[in-house]
């Protein structure tokens, strides 16, 4: 039995936008960013990161939105928000935890898969992100939805080693999800 999943990508920066564009080559993708200005720029065919060409932004299978409720249309969610570090090299997890809570509240349904690509330390996905999604959705990881992790492999500005030419490492909560 085959299942065609609809992808949503949360965070349309230098990591998320290339990921959304790559998946849109294969099917419908919802590109979500909480910043209305960023979404308006992308809809106008402008990419401030310089990672994506105009023609790729205009794929008719890629839809940009700043409405969190639109995440509900997806069933395979990829979270690619930044985890900036401060002067002491401590990561600011607020963008990631906020994205996890938003996805839990507005997008997560039974049978969904969530893959995190944000740079995080070991254990963070299961210890922090999953509880945030469970709290907001009322669902349980493992029985209602599954998670995965695939560290970002994008080097901004590198035109040689693009997303489609670099091997990805992936992990998942169970063999079926993998």
Regions found by a protein language model. Name each.
Residues 1-178:
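Structural/interface elements that position substrates and couple domains in central-metabolism enzymes
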């Amino acid at each position: 039995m085959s299942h065609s999943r609809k992808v949503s990508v949360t965070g349309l920066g230098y990591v998320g936008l290339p990921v959304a564009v790559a998946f849109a080559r294969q099917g419908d993708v919802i590109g979500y960013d909480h910043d209305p200005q960023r979404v308006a720029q992308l809809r106008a065919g402008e990419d401030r990161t310089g990672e994506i060409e105009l023609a790729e932004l205009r794929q008719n299978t890629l839809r940009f939105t700043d409405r969190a409720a639109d995440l509900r249309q997806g069933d395979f969610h990829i979270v690619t928000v930044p985890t900036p570090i401060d002067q002491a090299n401590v990561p600011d997890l607020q963008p990631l935890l906020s994205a996890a809570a938003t996805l839990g509240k507005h997008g997560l349904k039974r049978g969904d898969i969530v893959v995190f690509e944000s740079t995080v330390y070991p254990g963070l996905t299961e210890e922090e992100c999953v509880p945030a999604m469970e709290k907001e959705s009322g669902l349980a990881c493992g029985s209602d939805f599954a998670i995965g992790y695939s560290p970002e492999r994008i080097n901004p500005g590198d035109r040689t080693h693009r997303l489609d030419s670099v091997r990805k490492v992936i992990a998942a909560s169970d063999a079926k999800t993998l």
